[in-house]
Amino acid sequence: MSAPMVGMVVLVVTLGAAVLALSYRLWKLRQGGTAGIMRDIPAVGGHGWRHGVIRYRGEAAAFYRLSSLRLWPDRRLSRRGVEIVARRGPRGDEFDIMTDKIVVLELRDTTQDRRSGYEIALDQGALAAFLSWLESRPSPRTRRRSV
């Protein structure tokens, strides 16, 4: 095979892999979930917000950014490790991407491997879903009794 032919094969294979990855990501996003906007904190002003879809599955909530090509979730929150630190409405230039009906929650992930903070902006329906998921976790004081 000549060098141009090898280059063409590599290009076609690379483009095919990119199309497959994009198709998989779009398929994952279209499977449903709750719309939300999330950012890592600390953040300055209205910067860092990313639109996405939140999927609840058992003990974890997975956040898939709309603009990401990753095959896995961009953020994963453990129900046992998430704490709500503060609750507020949008402020300043956040109104460029949010309405006054949005609620912003400041979250702290206290699991051993993460120890980070997030802000998540949700409308009323998405907020009810998130709080229901979070509040249905077992109490840390409950222990399994042996029979």
From Swiss-Prot:
Keywords noted in UniProt: Membrane, Transmembrane, Transmembrane helix
Which cysteines share a disulfide bond?
none
Coiled-coil positions are: none
Q: Does the keyword tRNA processing apply?
A: no
Gene Ontology CC annotation, any one = membrane
- Cellular localisation: Membrane
- According to the record, the segments passing through the membrane are 3-23
Task: Tell me which Pfam families the record gives.
Answer: DUF2550
Q: How does it sit in the membrane?
A: Single-pass membrane protein
Similarity comment: family membership: To M.tuberculosis Rv1312.
What's the protein here called?
Uncharacterized protein ML1147
